[in-house]
Each structure stands twice: as C-alpha cells, then as structure tokens.
C-alpha cells in the first residue's frame, strides 16, 4: 500500500547493530558488578592474583554467556553429541582435566578420535541430510555344514536309484540325436547346395521330410522346446519368402508359373532353386535412389553418434 500502509517499527533492543546496551550504566548487571567493586575498564577477577600477569585487553571486553538447560558440569557429556554450541577449547580443557585425574595417553587419544568422528558425522549430516548406508547382503557367507548335508543327500539319492542312472544313460543318445537333427535343420541351404553337387529337390518333398521328422519327435518334450521350434519354423518361412521376393524373376518360378517355356515343360507345377539364385538372393542391394538415401541415413546416424563432431558444430555455431 506504500506510505499509507502500516509502518513496521522495530525496538532498539532487537537491533543487532545496537551497542547502546554496552554503554548503559543503569542495567542490572552493571549495577551488581559495580556493587562488588568493579569499575568500567577494569579486569575481571582479583587484582592481586597470581595469574594477574595473564590479563589482556580481552579480559576487559564483553563476554558471551550461554544459559545451561541442565544441571550437568563443565566436563559432562552433552545430550546431543552433534550439537555445535560447545564453547571453543572445551575439548582441550577436558583433556587437561583427564590428565589431572590420572588418565592415560591411550584413553585421551581414543577420546580425541571420538570427537573427530563426531565432527565428521555432523559435517555429513549437514552436507547430505538423508544419507543412510544399508548393507545389501550379497557377501553373506554360506554355512559349510549345510552344503555338506546337501551333498550327502545327493549321494544317497544316486546310490538308492540305480534305475534312474540307466534311464539317464538311455536318454543321452536320444538327446544327442535330437541335437544332430536340429543342427542339420539349422544349416543354411546355400552351403549345402555349394558344398555338394547341385541337387534339385522340390518343396513338397522338403515339407514331407520335415513332417516325418516332426512325427519322430518324442511326445514327452517340454512345451518350451516346442514353442522354440515353432518360432524357428516361422523364421525360416519368412526368410524363404524374403528370398523369393529378392531373387530375379528369370531364375525362380512362383507357385507353378515359370517364366521360360522349357522349364515349364520340364517341371509341371514344381519350383526349382539353384545355388546361384540363393547367392544372389542373399546379396540383395538397393539400386538407384535407394542407395543414395541409405547412404545419407547412415551418414546422419554416424554424425549423431559422434559426440566430438556435435560439440564442434555447437562451438562453431
């Protein structure tokens, strides 16, 4: 509201820059000390004391008074060890009291280390307030007795079941046969056609062989293996479709429709695949503007991945 608003008035006693209280002679403390024989500018304490030679200008200045909220002594342990309201030099004073009381140097060193740890903890608490270290439990040691018991149980089971051993020995050759069949299936078609003589086979015969092999599989296989085989068969079909689309029309016929009359007369409704056509299908490359576009996209990706080039661009701009 500007000048029409309520004015904020502060008392002189609440002003931190006010030093009138130090010069006033009507205060309670000034009156008590003057009644005890103290005069302004004089030192505190007896004038003829043995330690009067240690008095300095600081002895005549104002002192700081801290009100205690407990009835503990000077060397007592505070309630909050992380509190920083301790007077300066109290740790040295505590060490001195400990030496006078007959404490050894080892105990004094331990107390000094404890104080340093407390100071570090207070610094960490002020710097990172919500930090808490929790053990993860990954380095837990296993009990050796428990492992021995498990090994003994396994040995007993093996000795008590000789029939299970025979069954496992019989199952091993079956598993090896299945692995050989799967390897034979996973071999690429072009390697077979190039290594051996160019054998011509129809797709129908290939489908029949795959069906025969699928019937020979033992029905006790797990569901996961069946799912994997289905996925593999789907991938093969997709690869065959992609190869048919990429191979030129003059080499492979599509569904019984062959481009040449001679090939149509030789094979009625059958599709023949040669090794050269498979090699050409695998070496499919874009032509024309697709080559330029793919190069441009590749250069753009490489430039974005390079951090140094990006920094240079930003620096120059």
UniProtKB/Swiss-Prot annotation:
For this UniProt entry, the molecular function terms from Gene Ontology, in alphabetical order, are: nucleic acid binding
What subcellular compartments does it reside in?
Nucleus, Nucleolus
Biased amino acid composition, Basic residues = 171-182, 224-236
Skewed-composition ranges (Polar residues) = 192-219
Q: Which PROSITE patterns match?
A: G_PATCH
Q: Which UniProt keywords apply?
A: Nucleus, Ribosome biogenesis, rRNA processing
Q: Where is the composition biased (Basic and acidic residues)?
A: 154-170
Any one GO BP annotation for this protein:
rRNA processing
Domain G-patch positions: 25-79
Naming one, the record's GO cellular component terms include:
nucleolus
Note the superkingdom of the native organism.
Eukaryota
Region spans: Disordered: 152-268
Concerning InterPro entries, the annotation shows: G_patch_dom, PINX1
What PANTHER family has UniProt attached to this entry? Answer: G PATCH DOMAIN CONTAINING PROTEIN (PTHR23149), PROTEIN PXR1 (PTHR23149:SF31)
Q: Which family does it belong to?
A: Belongs to the PINX1 family.
> What is the role of this chain?
Involved in rRNA-processing at A0, A1 and A2 sites and negatively regulates telomerase.
Q: What is this protein called?
A: Protein PXR1
Q: Which organism is it from?
A: Coccidioides immitis (strain RS) (Valley fever fungus)
């Amino acid at each position: 509201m500007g000048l029409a608003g309520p004015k904020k008035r502060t008392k002189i006693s609440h002003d931190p820059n006010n030093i009138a209280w130090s010069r006033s002679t009507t205060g309670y403390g000034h009156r008590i000390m003057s009644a005890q024989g103290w005069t302004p500018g004089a030192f505190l304490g007896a004038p003829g004391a043995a330690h009067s030679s240690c008095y300095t200008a600081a002895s005549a200045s104002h002192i700081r008074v801290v009100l205690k909220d407990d009835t503990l002594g000077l060397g007592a342990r505070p309630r909050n060890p992380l509190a920083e309201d301790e007077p300066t030099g109290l740790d040295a004073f505590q060490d001195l009291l400990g030496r006078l009381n007959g404490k050894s140097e080892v105990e004094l060193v331990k107390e000094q280390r404890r104080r340093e740890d407390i100071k570090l903890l207070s610094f960490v608490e002020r710097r990172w307030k919500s930090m808490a270290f929790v053990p993860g439990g990954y380095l837990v040691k296993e009990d050796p007795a428990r492992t021995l018991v498990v090994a003994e149980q396994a040995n007993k089971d093996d000795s008590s079941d000789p029939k299970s051993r025979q069954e496992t020995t019989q199952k091993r050759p079956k598993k090896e046969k299945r692995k050989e069949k799967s390897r034979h299936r996973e071999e690429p078609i072009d390697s077979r056609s190039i290594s051996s003589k160019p054998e011509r086979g129809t797709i129908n015969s290939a489908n029949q062989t795959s069906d025969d092999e699928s019937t020979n599989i033992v029905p006790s296989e797990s569901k996961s293996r069946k799912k994997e085989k289905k996925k593999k068969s789907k991938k093969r079909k997709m690869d065959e479709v992609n190869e048919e689309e990429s191979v030129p029309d003059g080499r492979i016929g599509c569904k019984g429709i062959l481009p040449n009359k001679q090939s149509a007369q030789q094979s009625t409704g059958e599709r023949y695949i040669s090794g050269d056509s498979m090699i050409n299908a695998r070496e499919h490359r874009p032509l024309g503007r697709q080559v330029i576009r793919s190069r441009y996209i590749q250069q753009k990706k490489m430039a974005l991945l390079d951090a140094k080039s990006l920094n240079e661009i930003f620096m120059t701009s």
